[in-house]
């Protein structure tokens, strides 16, 4: 990737990699559907195709009945599922989740982890970055990094 120009790197980021953050980064004045459609708009997808794909992925994360709701009308767990749907809508090869349960209570965090397990069982590659041992222990593989060095690499 070091030889790619900015446009090529942006294309990879937008089409091959999905990102989920601890803070949901949803647009406050947009509906769940519009938030999920955003990456497709940047990718030049038609409005009809963007709606179809966004509705499908919202259904996949269990939020088809909340698609017209603004983030302020959703619980923290629902907002995180909208963020996950947005990360998945471009069908990325890999999903990076940076502290995806950090702002959630333990039950909602477990719900998000169950969703990740389901997605992984369907073939989605997911890398979760977490400081929470109880979250890490739910993964198939745990790589511990300290001071920039790999300290352990274990499969569950």
Residue map of PLM features:
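H-loop (His-switch) and adjacent beta-strand-loop-beta switch element
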Residues: 142-154
